[in-house]
């Protein structure tokens, strides 16, 4: 006789299979029949449409009035150069959401994505070919880079540009692909449960796990409108997270780490108050804290490890959610 249920089984297992730096499989199980696809499909849509990334939105090239122009001594036409630029993936540093960056090149040279990296921007596709300059030729240009989601057509930003700029179609999403498959999984001799496997590939601006985490946050934010009118009981996992030893340690003040005055002041001036804020940061985020030198960086990493955590390390999702609520409440 089939067991009668009053509530569907909630999945308990979560796994991440890191395939490469920019590709991962994210698995969760066991789901009741039909539940896996009900969650996987909207998550995939959020991954592709709502992941925040950077893209060039406009370019100004010395000596060029439009995208069908050319530059003396450059092998590529302006239109080809722009196409190559769109294939280049940018990441602004220091938390900036928009920047205008100037570049000057003199031939002969082969310009690649790596040549555009500087103190303001990181190129996460360094091997992208941009242009080839002949001897005695020069290429001077400015790029406007912005942060956004999805796709924005050049017509939508044209009116905001200064004279001389060429508007570009902007592809912001850092997620190159997101696919899923559903498999059956055995639970207590019952094969009618499901496992969802999400395959996520990014361009290097963010990790697949961060992209997945961001898509969950967007989904939760979209559902929050219902909770504003209808009181929904928090899942037991969140309630347990509020009482977990991890959360208590992560919400301790940074002075609990016993840092030197210089390291402490760097964090404090950047408004980093809790140990958990450091644990949630990536290594690049921590390195980009204003006036934080290598010695201070190494000290913070070491002290955090002594506390039981890693910079950019994995924390349980329920702990991350509870921790972010604590940080937002500061």
From Swiss-Prot:
Record key words, sorted: DNA-directed RNA polymerase, Nucleotidyltransferase, Transcription, Transferase
Q: Name one GO biological process term.
A: DNA-templated transcription
Highest rank taxon of the organism: Bacteria
Per the UniProt entry, the Enzyme Commission number(s) are 2.7.7.6
Give positions of region: Alpha N-terminal domain (alpha-NTD): 1-230
> Where are the stretches annotated Alpha C-terminal domain (alpha-CTD)?
244-330
What's the protein here called? DNA-directed RNA polymerase subunit alpha
Gene3D superfamilies registered for this protein in UniProt: 5' to 3' exonuclease, C-terminal subdomain (1.10.150.20), DNA-directed RNA polymerase, insert domain (2.170.120.12), RNA polymerase, RBP11-like subunit (3.30.1360.10)
Role description: DNA-dependent RNA polymerase catalyzes the transcription of DNA into RNA using the four ribonucleoside triphosphates as substrates.
What GO cellular component term, any one, is given?
cytoplasm
InterPro entries (alphabetical): DNA-dir_RNA_pol_insert, DNA-dir_RNA_pol_RpoA/D/Rpb3, DNA-dir_RpoA, RBP11-like, RNAP_asu_C, RNApol_insert_sf
Subunit info here reads: Homodimer. The RNAP catalytic core consists of 2 alpha, 1 beta, 1 beta' and 1 omega subunit. When a sigma factor is associated with the core the holoenzyme is formed, which can initiate transcription.
Which reaction(s) are listed as its catalytic activity? RNA(n) + a ribonucleoside 5'-triphosphate = RNA(n+1) + diphosphate
Please report which protein family the annotation says this sequence is part of.
Answer: Belongs to the RNA polymerase alpha chain family.
Q: What is the lineage of its organism?
A: Bacteria, Pseudomonadati, Campylobacterota, Epsilonproteobacteria, Campylobacterales
């Amino acid at each position: 006789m089939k067991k009668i249920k009053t509530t569907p089984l909630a999945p308990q297992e979560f796994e991440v299979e890191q395939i490469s730096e920019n590709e991962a499989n994210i698995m969760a199980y066991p789901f009741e029949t039909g539940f896996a696809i009900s969650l996987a499909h909207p998550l995939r849509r959020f991954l592709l449409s709502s992941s925040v990334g950077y893209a060039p939105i406009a370019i100004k090239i010395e000596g060029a009035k439009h995208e069908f122009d050319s530059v003396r001594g450059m092998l590529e036409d302006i239109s080809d150069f722009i196409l190559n630029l769109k294939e280049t993936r940018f990441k602004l540093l220091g938390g900036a959401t928009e920047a205008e960056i100037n570049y000057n090149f003199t031939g002969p040279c082969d310009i690649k994505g790596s040549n555009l990296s500087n103190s303001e921007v990181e190129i996460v596709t360094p091997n992208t070919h941009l242009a080839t300059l002949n001897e005695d030729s020069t290429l001077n240009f400015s790029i406007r880079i912005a942060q956004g989601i999805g796709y924005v057509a050049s017509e939508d930003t044209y009116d905001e540009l200064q004279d001389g700029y060429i508007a570009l179609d902007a592809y912001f999403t850092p997620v190159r692909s997101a696919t899923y498959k559903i498999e059956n999984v055995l639970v207590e001799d019952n094969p009618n449960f499901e496992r969802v496997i999400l395959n996520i590939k990014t361009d290097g601006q963010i990790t697949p796990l961060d992209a997945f985490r961001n898509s969950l946050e967007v989904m939760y934010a979209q559902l929050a409108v219902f909770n504003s009118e209808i009181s929904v009981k928090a899942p037991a996992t969140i309630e347990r997270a509020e009482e977990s030893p991890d959360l208590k340690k992560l919400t301790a003040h940074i002075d609990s780490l016993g840092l030197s005055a210089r390291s402490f002041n760097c964090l404090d001036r950047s408004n980093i108050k809790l140990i958990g804020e450091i644990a949630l940061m990536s290594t690049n985020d921590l390195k980009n804290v204003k006036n934080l030198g290598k010695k201070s960086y190494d000290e913070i990493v070491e002290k955090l490890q002594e506390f039981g955590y890693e910079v950019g390390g994995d924390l349980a999702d329920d702990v991350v959610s509870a921790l972010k609520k604590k940080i937002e409440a500061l």
